[in-house]
């Protein structure tokens, strides 16, 4: 990172900051590694959370920042109560729609495991469904807006949710 004069700004102030970042990063990698890819067609094939970690951190941070900025703008425009809630829900629906995709098992397996030379090779991004699910299940607002409770498929306990930035 750089300041307005082009001088480098350290991302981590001290070793404790760096250690906490590494701990949270591993939590996020574990979360993404728990996501099964196309369970009906590829049972037992899971996302590689360590391989996709950099992009998963970027996705999570980006969504959290965008949601906060969007919410602040809505409030400045006078949205409140149920109307604010509806617009916030639409944010998450738009995010999911953005990553909507359809692919076959061979494609999914290749991008997840990188075992077939016919396709592009292993991808540093999670597949679309896992990319969305891995983000929303770590954002507290999603639980409130969609009334996600223990026992629901994408539920994570509050202490297990990862907030890096």
Where are these regions (language model features)?
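Zinc-dependent metallohydrolase catalytic domains
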Residues: 1-165
